[in-house]
Amino acid sequence: MIDFSAYIQSDWAWIVLFVMAVFVGMSKTGVQGLAILTVPMLAMTFGAKPSTGLMLPVLCFADVIGVSYYRRQAEWKYIIRLLPMAVAGFFLALWVDNMIPATEFKHLMGGCLALVLAVMLWSQYKGKENILIDKWWYSPLFGLLGGFTTMIGNAAGPVMAIYLLSTRMPKMAFVGTNAWFFLCVNFLKLPFQIFAWHNINLTTLAIDACAVPFVLIGAFLGIRLVKFLPERGFRIFTTIVTIISVLVMLLV
C-alpha cells in the first residue's frame, strides 16, 4: 500500500487538492485562469516545488478532457507562434531556478502582465484593436512568459488569457486554442519535472488519481458555464478572473 504521509499530513491537504482539481477542470473547459487561484494554497500546503509536481499530472488529465471536447475549435496559427518560445521559457526557468527566488520572478511577471492587461483594456475601452497584437515580438514574448511561468509554478493561465483576449477570437476558439496550447506545453514539461526536479513519482501520481473525479466535476461545470455565457459575457467574466489571477501573482 502506498504511504501518502510524506505529502498528505492532514485533512486540509486533501481539501486543497480536491479544490485544485475542480478549479483545474473548470479552467480547462472554459473558466480561464481559475486554476492559478489554487497555486498559493498548494504551495503553502505541500511546498513550492512539490506542489508543481502534484499539480502537473492533474493539469495533463484536464488538458486531455479539454482537447477532446474542443478539439476542432483551435486557432493553430497562434499556437505555432507561441510554442517555440514557450519551450525556451522552460530552459530559462531551469537556469534561474537556483539563482533567483521564484517569488521575485512571479511578482515581476505579475507586474508585466498587469501592464499588458491595462493596455488591452484601454484599447477595448477606446473601441480600437489591440495596438500590440501585430508587433513581431508580441507572440514570442507571451510564449516565453507562458513557458517560464508554467514551469516555475503552473501559473501561465493569466498569460494565455491576456494573449487570447487580445486576439478577440470567439469564445469557443478561445477555449479550444487554450486547451491545445496547454496540452502541448504540459506534456512537454513532464520530462523536466520528472528528471530535472524529481517532483513526480508513483506516490504523487497515486495522490493525483484520487483527484480525478473532482477534475471531471470541474470540467462539467466549465462546459456548462461556457454554453451559458454569451460572447460578451464570456469576455467580461474571463477578464475579471484574469485580473484576480494577476493580483494573486503580485500579492501572494
Per-segment meaning from a language model:
Residues W14-I80, F142-G143, G147, G157-V215:
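Small-residue-rich hydrophobic segments that form or flank transmembrane alpha-helices
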Residues L92, V96-D97, G147-A155, K189-Q193, ...:
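Hydrophobic alpha-helical transmembrane segments in multi-pass integral membrane proteins
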